[in-house]
Amino acid sequence: FEYRETIKRLALLSGDYPAIEGVLLDDMSSIGIDKGFRPEHIREIRRLLDEGCPRIKTWGVVYTMNFNRPDINEYMRELDVISLWTWHARDVVNLEQNVLRVRESFPEKPIVVGLYLYDYGEGRRMPMDLLKLQCGTALALLEGKQIQGLVFLTIDNDAEAVEWTT
């Protein structure tokens, strides 16, 4: 895992585009770990960011289905922002519990909740009742200041889901 050149390019871009706030380590808690990504890699990314563009934060995608992976808390500890996603729509009923679990372990870390409009875990349309539950729960968590933001993964192949969320 080599990030030096990418972070050099990011440092140049971030000077011209102050809206760039962070880097996102997508699929960190699943594919990344499977390919050998370790907490020390996050530390190295943060060190390089501190040298070249210190205002840029390190965000990492953590899937709730990966909570039981060995050392997952060590990965989350190294992040500046935890981007929490529920892969299987059937598990959105546990969204509040999952946020509180992360909040208890890392009370100082910002958490943003990722919201899918598609059930990637089952490879199907997101059932509307679960979409509404997911969005309603996330909004309540945001209003209650348990999370700091929401991220929608948008799609354009399910008109009903898109229309409901707009």
Language-model features, listed with the residues they occupy:
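Glycan-processing catalytic domains of CAZymes
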Residues: 1-166
